[in-house]
Amino acid sequence: MSTDLKQVNKSKKALQRNDNLSESKFVERLIKISRVSKVTKGGKKLSFRAIVVVGNENGQVGVGVGKADDVVNAFKKAKADGRKNLIKIPITKSLSIPHNVIGIFGACKIIMRPSIEGSGVIAGGSVRTVLEVAGIKNVIAKQLGSNNVLNNARAAVSGLNNLTTKSQVLKKRDLHSNSSEKINS
């Protein structure tokens, strides 16, 4: 009986190790930590808000927000939220995006264009962090509108979510890539 229990515990530990290994593939980058307060009749209650970008540098990225009484717990909550909001994006062979795309969230507008190999990530602030964590190495991005860090990160994710590959477009239009028909615009 006790040997069976030991084997079960060993297998649970092995599963936990495998989970930890799969979690280690993800990169977490902190964008911002803010001290926020809630005013109650007893006074001001201070807490912390963390904004984190989570990704595997291979086409998956998500933005998470967490609030807690201390910085460590806020960061943990933001990481968990980022993992819940992961999206998969297509990346070209030159580690760029397949086509121009615009991402909008609130008053933020992000314009992203593919760039030649070796040009690097030309973007600022939280958009740069989102693109790097997603695994995009060659892209040009411009922020328009609001300078809000969280909304800019979410606008970048929204734009990346709108990316499509050639095969997806052909499938949507009921065409085949090796068809001899001309596509009229």
From Swiss-Prot:
UniProt cross-references to Gene3D superfamilies, sorted A to Z: 3.30.160.20, 3.30.230.10
Pfam families assigned: Ribosomal_S5, Ribosomal_S5_C
Location of this chain's protein in the cell: Plastid, Chloroplast
PROSITE patterns the UniProt entry points to: RIBOSOMAL_S5 (PS00585), S5_DSRBD (PS50881)
GO CC terms of this entry: chloroplast; small ribosomal subunit
Keyword Chloroplast applies: yes
Keywords tagged on the record: Chloroplast, Plastid, Ribonucleoprotein, Ribosomal protein, RNA-binding, rRNA-binding
Gene Ontology biological-process entries: translation
GO molecular function, one term: structural constituent of ribosome
Listed PANTHER family: MITOCHONDRIAL RIBOSOMAL PROTEIN S5 (PTHR48277:SF1)
Subunit structure: Part of the 30S ribosomal subunit. Contacts protein S4.
Comment on protein domains: The N-terminal domain interacts with the head of the 30S subunit; the C-terminal domain interacts with the body and contacts protein S4. The interaction surface between S4 and S5 is involved in control of translational fidelity.
Name the UniProt record assigns to this protein: Small ribosomal subunit protein uS5c
Lineage: Eukaryota, Sar, Stramenopiles, Ochrophyta, Bacillariophyta
